[in-house]
Amino acid sequence: TGVKPISASENTETGMDGIYTKAMTEFEIKSMIQSFTDAAIRCKKAGFHGVELHGAHSYLICQFLGQETNRRTDKWGGDIVGRSRFLTEIIRSVRSAVGEDFLIAVRISPIIEKAGIYLDDSLELVKIISEMEIDMLHISCWDVFQAVDDGNDASLTKRFRKIIPKTIPLISTGAVWDSKDAQWLIDEGADIVGVARVGIGHPDWPSFLVDSNYQPQRPPFSVEHLANVD
């Protein structure tokens, strides 16, 4: 398009052919916060009951959260308080605009080492946003069963559930496939089980979970299978 991409700092990535992002100015940051707010307002006007602020998967909010992708020295960078300011200001602005009767969920990735997102910072981040007016927290774990190499055997779900208030429901997502996986995640402290891949191949997946032996077909899916998905 010829438009230079923007980010928290000047960054590049494999596949960008040497193109670097432009570090956002103070004006651009505040304008983007307003853009998130305007999007939430449109959702409310359209009849939705809430929005999820996507701070995971290396998208823009996530780029502000990472130590590697956010190397700013102003108030939008530095420690986790500074690096989370973009997200917290979005939460504050959206809540002010949509009122108390509209749900706000926040989604984060607990660990993305390439971006400089580490578990300790993510736990601190959750403590910060749990004190704000959010209604749900969504942790996108890539794999909810993964172990963290820190001598602590507790799952990511259990660690986050331990530090967030019981009044805030926890959604946990990543590599859940069958009913046993879902039950394990609930037992670890998730209030809601999030899925992606299995839901694409089996959109009626939740209706089969009552069967503890349910084993949905795994990828790769055939063209015929996907063509017949409701």
Predicted ranges, named:
Residues 1-230:
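Flavin-dependent oxidoreductase catalytic cores
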